[in-house]
Each structure stands twice: as structure tokens, then as C-alpha cells.
A protein has these predicted regions:
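Aromatic- and histidine-enriched alpha-helix N-cap/loop-to-helix transition segments
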Residues: 1-8, 29-33, 131-143, 198-201, ...
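Extended glycan-interaction surfaces of carbohydrate-active proteins
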Residues: 1, 50-132, 169-254, 287-291
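Extended amphipathic secondary-structure runs
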Residues: 113-159
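Short amphipathic alpha-helical segments
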Residues: 257-261, 273-281, 290
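Internal, well-ordered domain-core segments that constitute the primary functional module
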Residues: 2-75
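Short, flexible helix-adjacent loops and helix caps
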Residues: 15-19, 46, 152-156, 179, ...
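Well-ordered alpha-helical scaffold segments within catalytic/enzyme domains
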Residues: 5-22, 138-157, 205-215, 259-274
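Extended, well-ordered alpha-helical scaffold segments
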Residues: 21-41, 143, 147, 154-174, ...
Length: 291
């Protein structure tokens, strides 16, 4: 899978549609499809039914080589994988890409899941890598809320009720990932039951969900703090952490899609000053480096 942005995207597109009635039937079909996708997450990645879903491969989060995964990744073997040739390093600087050791583990997981026939009833518990990512869950929460609101508008009451229920439970459970010490949300290693001490942008992305205002304010302050150490907002990892790498993919560099979602969440929380800084920095980054 990939981050579940579809519910948010569909509602945003529908709101901007010049003639909603013309596309209503198509939108209803998409609402049904996204509702089934959301159900898949909670059925297959939330075995304890606590409202938080796990990723079982770093690729699913879209933040492939984040520091967030290092601890849990140590449990993934590298022995016995098939020979492979990487294509990504042929068109990108290898120093900017995940390491060979990380790729070995990526592929071990893929081959392991394939050996299980991609049976979703088995994959979660069979994976040595089970991480609850606050950013991933925030996206799912936001998409559930947005899909529910859209379904309500279209009088698809069952879909609306179901997605509101998922979103509210998940939003409440998201608080289990908050760290007063780190002043942000952290990933949870579901195998050990421990929070992962990694100050990544994944914990800041929680503001994309409608978290309570005090938490949003704390994240805005945290973003201001870590961005002060960089030329542009928002680094994908805390520059004060020794594991920060300014050039390597998700261990330091700025990602505009993350800036977009965090900015959207800050605007929704009426934190205009913080969101304006992110927009200004993003535009300056595009101006200096291209898009």
C-alpha cells in the first residue's frame, strides 16, 4: 500500500469542481472504493482494533529510509535474498539514496511476503517490521474524516457513519504516540510495544489530522525550532540528531508534499503565522532549486 491520501484528495477535487452534479455518479463510485480501502487498513493492519494501523514495509509509508525505521529494521535479515541490480542509483547520486544494506532488507521483506502468497491475513503478524507511523495514521484519519463529510453530502449515510467512527477512534488513539520529552508524536514499534526515539517529520505530519489545538501549537513550535537550523522548512529529520543526513533522501532533505500537508493542517488549526513561513520557504526553495 501507500499513504491513504485518496479520501482527502477526492473531497478537495470535488470542492473545486465547476459542475458537481455532472460528476456525482463517478464520485459516488470513488467514495465506495475508498471506503473499501479504509476498511482494508483497519481489517488487516490493526489487529488489536485500537484504531492505529501499522506499516509492514518502509516503502508503504513513502518515507523509505527514514531514521524512524532503523530500530525495527535491525530485526529484518539480509541473508538469502535473490541477486538484484539497483536502477535508482543509475539516475541519482548513490549518496542521496538508501544504502545497500537497507535495500537488502527491503527486498527480504518483499520476498518474505511473496512466500506467503501475499495473504493479508498473514502478512502483518509474519512481518518482523511492524511500525505505527503517526504521519501515516494522520493521513488515514484525515482521509476518513474527509470521506465521511463527502459521503454525508452525497447522502451515503452508511459510508459516512463508518468513516466518522474510524476517524474518531483513531484520533483518540493517536495520543498514545505523543511524547512530552520530544514534544512531538513518535512512531511505535508494535513488536516491542515501545515508542521509537526518532524526531522525524512523520511525527510533525500528525497535524494533518484534526488533533487538539494545544498539540497543533506544540508541533508548530517544534517545526519552528528544527527549521531554524536549516535554510528551508521543514527538514525531514531533526538536524540536532546525529543521524541527520542533509543529502540522503528522508533523513534530512525537505519534501514539498510534506510541507503541503503540514501547512494544510496548520491552516486548519488557525496557526497562520507558522503556515505562512512554510509556504514562503517552499516557494523560495523552488525558486532557487527548481521544481
Amino acid at each position: 500500500t501507500q499513504p491513504p491520501v485518496a479520501g482527502f484528495v477526492l473531497r478537495r477535487l470535488y470542492q473545486r469542481c465547476a459542475d458537481p452534479e455532472e460528476v456525482e455518479e463517478r464520485v459516488e463510485d470513488l467514495v465506495d472504493a475508498i471506503d473499501r480501502w479504509h476498511a482494508w487498513f483497519f481489517e488487516n493492519r490493526d489487529p488489536q482494533r485500537d484504531g492505529l494501523v501499522s506499516i509492514i514495509h518502509p516503502w508503504e509509508a513513502g518515507r523509505d529510509n527514514s531514521v524512524d525505521w532503523d530500530q525495527a529494521f535491525e530485526r529484518v535479515p539480509t541473508e538469502g535474498i535473490s541477486e538484484y541490480t539497483r536502477r535508482d542509483t543509475e539516475h541519482a547520486n548513490p549518496e542521496h539514496r538508501p544504502t545497500k544494506e537497507q535495500y537488502d532488507r527491503y527486498l527480504w521483506l518483499v520476498e518474505h511476503f511473496r512466500s506467503l502468497g501475499w495473504d493479508n491475513s498473514k502478512l502483518h503478524d509474519a512481518s518482523p517490521f511492524q511500525v505505527v507511523d503517526p504521519g501515516f495514521n494522520a493521513i488515514l484519519i484525515r482521509s476518513c474524516f474527509d470521506l465521511a463529510a463527502l459521503a454525508e453530502e452525497l447522502e451515503m449515510d452508511d459510508v459516512a457513519h463508518r468513516n466518522y467512527a474510524w476517524a474518531r477512534q483513531s484520533l483518540e488513539s493517536l495520543e498514545d504516540l505523543w511524547s512530552d520529552q520530544h514534544r512531538q508524536y513518535l512512531c511505535l514499534d508494535r513488536t516491542t510495544g515501545q515508542l521509537i526515539e526518532s524526531n522525524s517529520v512523520g511525527g510533525l505530519l500528525a497535524v494533518f489530522a484534526p488533533i487538539r489545538h494545544g498539540r497543533a501549537q506544540a508541533l508548530a513550535q517544534r517545526i519552528e525550532q528544527i527549521s531554524a537550523e536549516c535554510r528551508f522548512s521543514i527538514p525531514s529529520h531533526d538536524p540536532a540528531d546525529s543521524r541527520f543526513d542533509a543529502k540522503r533522501y528522508w533523513r534530512g532533505p525537505v519534501w514539498l508534499i510534506i510541507n503541503y500537508m503540514i501547512n494544510d493542517g496548520l491552516e486548519a488549526a488557525s496557526l497562520a503565522e507558522s503556515s505562512t513561513k512554510i509556504v514562503d520557504d517552499s516557494l523560495q526553495l523552488i525558486g532557487s532549486s527548481g521544481f
